[in-house]
Each structure stands twice: as C-alpha cells, then as structure tokens.
Amino acid sequence: MKAPVRVTVTGAAGQISYSLLFRIAAGEMLGADQPVILQMLEITPALEALKGVAMELDDCAFPLLHSMVCTDDANVAFKDSDYALLVGARPRGPGMERNDLLEANAAIFSVQGKAINDHASRGIKVLVVGNPANTNALIAQRNAPDIDPRQFTAMTRLDHNRGMSQLASKLDVSINDITKMTIWGNHSSTQYPDLYHALVKGDAAIDKVDSTWYAEEYIPTVQQRGAAIIKARGASSAASAANAAIFHMRDWALGSPEGDWVSMGVYSDGSYGIEKGLIYSFPCVCKNGDWEIVQGLSIDEFSQARMTATETELQGERDAVKALLPA
C-alpha cells in the first residue's frame, strides 16, 4: 500500500462536500491503492456539523481512509497538504451585487492562499470549486507566491460535463461517444461551450447539429444550467459539482483519457491570445500529474467573439478585487 496523501477540503460540512468526501475516501479521486488523510476546514459555527460528517465517514469503515482532521484553522487544514479542494465560499445573499460577492470571497481566499503558501506541500494541487471560482483561484494563487501558479486551478468540469450531456441527449448517443468537448473562459454565464472541435463517434459534432440550435439553444442551456437547477431544486447543484471535482482532480493526478482532452480553469500563458495570468478555462491534456493547454486549434470569428467576451468578464472581476491582491 502507498503512503497516505493529505487531502484538504474546505467548506467540509456543506452540501457539495457531503457528496464529495465519501467518494474521496472510497478511492474514486486518487485510485483504489491510495490511502488518504482528510483535512477538513469549516467556519467555527459549523464545526459541530462537521463532527457529524466525520462520524459518518468513520462509520463507512473505508479501507483507504487513514485518518481525519477537523478544524477551523486554515494553517492546520493546509499543513503538508498534497491536494486541496476549496469548496467553501461566501454564497450570494439577497441584494448582494456581484462585486460585493467578489470582495467577500477575496477575504476568504487570500487567507487560504497564504496558508497554502506557508504550510502546504510544495507540490500541492489546488482546485477551486467555490464561486466565483476563476477569480477565487486567482486570489488564492496571488497570495501564494512561493507556489507555482500552475498548481492553482478552477473548476469548469461541471460545465464540460453539462455540455457533453446536452449534446448526447440531442443526438441520442452515449456520453462515451463524445470526445474533445471544450469550455472556454469563466465558470459563469459568459462561458463558451465550443463544439467546433468536439467529435461524436470520431466525426465532427458541429456537422451533426443545426447552427441555430447550437447558437440559440445549446450554448445558453449550458451557460445557464446552474440557474435552472436552482429554480427546479430550490438549491444549487451539489452532487454534480462534487462529481465534476472528482473527475477534475482524478484526471489531473492520474492522467486524462488517451485521445481526448478536458476543460480546466488554469493559469493563462497567453495561449489563444488570452491575457497572461488570468485563470481561464482551456482544453487541457493531463499526464504525469501535470496539465498542458491543447495548442493549434483553429478559432473562427464566432468562437473568437465569445472567447473574448468571457475574457473581458474575467478581467473585470480581477480589476474589482485588484486593491485586495498582493502587488
């Protein structure tokens, strides 16, 4: 058996984490031969609820769950951490503007970024799930100057999975028949679900769908799926978000499927003309515990306009919290 690795989960008593922690402990994220130490962070008022979650984890008797830490101290939660899933974030309350939300979360993610910088393993892999995920990841990354910025990612895998599912449903094919789905940009309603490079059973997906359906139904459906779930369920998507987090980390750690790629919010190196340093979703291939942006994809005017629009939104979010970012 391998030596255990430390996995930090923030917002650990929340809805998404309740769908996430048990799957991590069962080996779904890092493999059936990798023991884990779960380091769970919560705000002080939620520690009692977290204790209940830890009791349930105990009661599952997972062979791979080596031990657990429950804490309200970020420095303890990130100590020697190898993987971190930053799920906890300030939800948008009634009457809150987006900029209020950005500022409230900037405070949370700057503290966590500093704790990662000071206490985590130098090779830590960080996935930000809590919204606004791309900008929260940027804030954490900027507060961890001693950690390679490539080690901070934001989750757009839920959008990627939604895009695949909507296409599979339209064409009446299996999810397994679809490859090379791409989400560009922000995890928000400006994201661009791109089918121009996607394949269905090896054939171009874009040739199988009507252009009006693609532009006027498919793209808005994927962009606004989160809001549709809140309307139907009365709560935001939790199990599907947890599932996407598992997929994102699993592929980053263990490798993405051969001949395919995944969508990840990553540190832009200027690829496709996107401003360097933004956390932007690109098509990525993962192997040997690292990711690379897929290069050389042709981008037409339709795609370029949408890729730029979501970049502009991310620049605006960054500028809204600029005063709170380290120089």
UniProtKB/Swiss-Prot annotation:
Function, in words: Catalyzes the reversible oxidation of malate to oxaloacetate.
Name of the featured protein: Malate dehydrogenase
Underlying gene: mdh
Binding site for substrate: 92, 98, 131, 162
InterPro entries: L-lactate/malate_DH, Lactate/malate_DH_C, Lactate/malate_DH_N, Lactate_DH/Glyco_Ohase_4_C, Malate_DH_type2, NAD(P)-bd_dom_sf
NCBIfam families membership: MalateDH-SF1 (TIGR01759), PRK05442.1 (NF003916)
Class in the EC hierarchy, top level: oxidoreductase
Catalytic activity: (S)-malate + NAD(+) = oxaloacetate + NADH + H(+)
Keywords: NAD, Oxidoreductase, Tricarboxylic acid cycle
Family affiliation: Belongs to the LDH/MDH superfamily. MDH type 2 family.
SUPFAM superfamilies: LDH C-terminal domain-like, NAD(P)-binding Rossmann-fold domains
Gene Ontology MF terms in the entry: L-malate dehydrogenase (NAD+) activity
Species this chain originates from: Teredinibacter turnerae (strain ATCC 39867 / T7901)
Pfam families: Ldh_1_C, Ldh_1_N
Keyword set includes Glycoprotein: no
Enzyme Commission number(s): 1.1.1.37
Family annotation (CDD domains): MDH_chloroplast-like
Binding site for NAD(+): 11-17, 105, 112, 129-131
One biological process term in Gene Ontology: malate metabolic process
Active site, per annotation: 187 (proton acceptor)
